[in-house]
Amino acid sequence: MEKLFKGIAKFRREDFESHRQLFKELGRKQQPHTLFIGCSDSRVVPELITRTRPGELFMIRNVANIVPPYRKTEDFAGTTSAIEYAVHVLDVEAIVVCGHSNCGGCAALHKSPEELQHIPNVARWLDASHEVKERVKKQVVEGTPGAVADRVLEELEATKRREPVGSLAG
């Protein structure tokens, strides 16, 4: 925790002061141009890889950068509610679903229910990608390296998501 507190203090002293006007504007209103849906993995830093500044990306981060099917629900729906907000309130221009290599969430998609029983919420979350995983398994040639298979899975899932996400704008 000490490292975090020192980082916050240094940010206030250095970064905040050198970008005071930007943060003043962001304090009044946000107008991100892009909804960025990415993995919670600590190695993925969206602002760093996209070279964007505070206020440019509206971000959703979750295990395996999954976008569950859109539906009205009484349950908590963090990802879909953030998409609604970005599309209907913030009027973002673009939506990016960003996968990455060596994703633990994508690797967990290939585990048995028994292997995931100690993380039941993650297991349930990954169920949202079960249909896509099965489709990929039929299309991927046997012997395909795991990383390539995972990348194909991510791409197919992103394709599956386009229609439900796009239908929000209409």
Where are these predicted regions, by residue range?
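Structural motif
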Residues: H33-F36, E56-F58, E93-V96
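N-terminal low-complexity or amphipathic/hydrophobic leaders
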Residues: G27-P46
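Short beta-strand segments
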Residues: I37-C39, R61, C98-H100
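Gly/Ser/Thr-rich loops at beta-strand to alpha-helix junctions
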Residues: D41-R43, H100-G105
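Catalytic core of membrane glycerolipid acyltransferases/transacylases, capturing the structured
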Residues: R43-I66
